[in-house]
Amino acid sequence: MAIQKLENYNNKEAIREEVTILTSILEEVAAQMMPAETFAKIVELSQLSRQDDYQALIAIISQLNNDELAVISRYFAVLPLLINISEDVDLAYEINHQNNIDQDYLGKISTTIDMVSKQENAAEILEKLNVVPVLTAHPTQVQRQSMLDLTKHIHELLRRYRDVKLGLLNKNKWEDELRCYIEIIMQTDMIREKKLKVTNEITNVMEYYNSSFIKAVTKLQREYKRLAAEKGIVLNNPRPITMGMWIGGDRDGNPFVTAETLKLSALTQCEVIMNYYDEQLYKLYRNFSLSTSIVNVSTAVKMLADLSEDSSVYRENEPYRRAFHYIQMKLANTRDYLVHNKPSDVRYSNVAEFKADLLAIKQSLVENKSMALLKGDFTELLEAVEAFGFYLASIDMRQDSSIHEASVAELLASARIVEDYSSLSEEAKCHVLLKQLETDPRILSATHMPKSEQLEKELAIFAAARELKDKLGEEIIKQHIISHSESVSDLLELAVLLKEVGLVDVDKARVQIVPLFETIEDLDNAPDTMRQYLQLDLAKRWIAGNKYYQEIMLGYSDSNKDGGYLSSGWTLYKAQNELTQIGQDYGVNITFFHGRGGTVGRGGGPSYDAITSQPFGSIKDRLRLTEQGEVIGNKYGNKDAAYYNLEMLVSATLDRMVTQMITDPNEIDGYRETMDEIVSDSYRIYRDLVFNNPHFYDYFFAASPIREVSSLNIGSRPAARKTITEIGGLRAIPWVFSWSQNRVMLPGWYGVGSSFKRFIDKHPDNLSKLQKMYESWPFFRSLLSNVDMVLSKSNMNIAFEYAKMCESEEVRNIFHVILDEWQLTKEIILSIEQNDELLAELPFLKASLDYRMPYFNVLNYIQIELIHRLRRGELSKEQENLIHITINGVATGLRNSG
């Protein structure tokens, strides 16, 4: 029997019971907030939706006035939020329960380490493994921080419901508290009135570290070492999970990211982890009341105690307490120096010194037979220090290649080296850049020529990066990503800019230069680009200084918008294969940074399946992947969910590393030609609609809420890099978000049905061939399973109502093209999977959608009516906010956005 996903163990009855309680309280709160006739409309709309009587539902909605729509929208937006909380609580319960009874589930770390332990090089695998979830901000993250805080309170109350049922807590008091928070939610603005600033995004993401990441990462690292030790594998300093972050350093398309935000991002996370250490040290100070009249201590601990300023006579015989007091004081001085530039002679120069003091205490406890004290708070602190050091996450810097080129061109012109650099050929550009990097020691910016604002900002943020690395350590900023990388000159231009502040010289690069290949064309050309780069003597030296590792980032969002779902997935797969082989040819370990979003249209889907379906050889011992703003709350909103999702990332990576050692990659060689043929058709079908159909642009802007999405105050970054006059100018994230809102989900499936149908029709054996591929090839199975999931969340009846907003019949007819492809795709997917219905292999998701769909379907119909009124000029400026409430509710119901 196949190992079950943990979600399959969920207690459907418990969820339904909790949802019934939440719904009942929400109804009571709504009834007291609005006129009786308005609440009666809510009851009627709910009944009609459950009965699938949407024509009657549409008729009622069209008769509601704007004030009625406001309160009704809020009700139906809150309901899926409460359902989400109940599901999250049950998942947290199951995570703990299944671990406590030692029940196996997919991604369980103990099972995975047992598998790894059977390999000859098990210790090397486990020691070197490093998986890095990189947290990003998100221009379509819809939840306000205030709403997230309120949901946390309800989450904690629901976690106590089992105690209420057992009579351990007073039910009336519990329900009153629950009612209080639901009432607050119903009276709290769901949508921001002001656009987020980068500083807000930094503060918001820090809350996840306080509530979940610090404890989850620490626990996972501790379990990882313990399980390895049980198998006789001694690990020195494993770091299976380290954290990354873009917030404060990702300025691609975001003019509000500056040198100041980079510093703030680094110093804020430094302060957060230091405060955590301070709290842990204080707990240890209070608890470690060991007396020298009873137990001995080491000389090292005595020395630490003697340095303490705790002169209380009551602690003369309590050296551990005084030692912790001294460490706490020294750490506080370190924090003040790093964060506030306050000098002190008594501070830690680096995290190794801090750790050494803690290890001295540990050694003393071991020597004096007090090992039980090493468990709990002390070990948790020590593991946190090993996992995080003096900052929580390494910050990535990112900028578009065109900005680098313009900056370098300005520098070269001001230094009178090349007047019009941008007009040079690629070969000539590389010649100029290599000369600057290899033989010209000049700082190009050290002229008296005036500089553009853009160049000043770029040089300032690079200087800030240098300052932070010097102060906090090399790993605070490890890589700089180049968006829209197309050529070797794109990589060398960044190197020239880094050279300006001393982060690159002829022998080493203190910041790794990471190309991001995004479009189908750039991914196809990536192997040639990297081959040319790896041949450079300069690049060889830089990579040697990075232990022969070279990272490459892969863009899932733009490649999907550019070529469609199948083309994106297959092009990324082939690019990884080729780039991995090129790395082997040059003695370089190519590692991949997967720029996945939350939705399938942006490379999303179940993390475990995504990782275990990567090409053979493409995962060695390092893997980085983005965790984008709108899914961070879903996956890491509490410490149990965070542990489970981090555990899955580590287990999946180990699984793929071991599997590729024991599996013959030639087994799938016969499938490549098939995929090339199908994907070629899919690419053409997708491009014919999205880029070549003259009516598609008008259809998208009329039959989706893209304009309303673009006006939402839901992120610091603009929705487009420039004014939107064509599909290519739109960012991938709001593109996908809008298709999610109108329930077409086009980026996750369009072009799949027709391309597979053509292949199947060519030969009677082709369907069985595809079925075999689905059964035996993880990549193909994951590819189609994601399509299955997207189709299940789409709703063509709702999509048709959006299509009616198109004024021209020619434009409106685009819907029928989409509908035909949707129906064909569903039919083909089920025939390849050999299933009778969608989500047959994901029963937990099917059950979840079945009981939440009726509620947030209502929101779609309300949204359509509101957009009609907006376009007819029947909504005031203030009432436009109602559309944003429906957008929020639909995204909440789908559990993802862009």
UniProtKB/Swiss-Prot annotation:
Active-site residues, record numbering mapped to chain: 138, 561
SUPFAM superfamilies to which the protein is assigned, alphabetical: Phosphoenolpyruvate/pyruvate domain (SSF51621)
Transmembrane segments: none
Superkingdom classification of source: Bacteria
Chemical reaction(s) catalysed: oxaloacetate + phosphate = phosphoenolpyruvate + hydrogencarbonate
UniProt KW Magnesium keyword: yes
A GO molecular-function descriptor: magnesium ion binding
Annotated organism of origin: Streptococcus suis (strain 05ZYH33)
Cofactor field: Mg(2+)
Keywords tagged on the record: Carbon dioxide fixation, Lyase, Magnesium
One Pfam family recorded for the sequence: PEPcase
Record GO biological process: carbon fixation; oxaloacetate metabolic process; tricarboxylic acid cycle
Family: Belongs to the PEPCase type 1 family.
GO cellular component terms, A-Z: cytosol
Keyword Calcium: no
Record EC number: 4.1.1.31
Name of this protein: Phosphoenolpyruvate carboxylase
Function: Forms oxaloacetate, a four-carbon dicarboxylic acid source for the tricarboxylic acid cycle.
UniProt-listed InterPro entries: PEP_COase (IPR021135), PEP_COase_bac/pln-type (IPR022805), PEP_COase_Lys_AS (IPR018129), PEPCASE_His_AS (IPR033129), Pyrv/PenolPyrv_kinase-like_dom (IPR015813)
Gene3D superfamilies to which the protein is assigned, alphabetical: Phosphoenolpyruvate/pyruvate domain (1.20.1440.90)
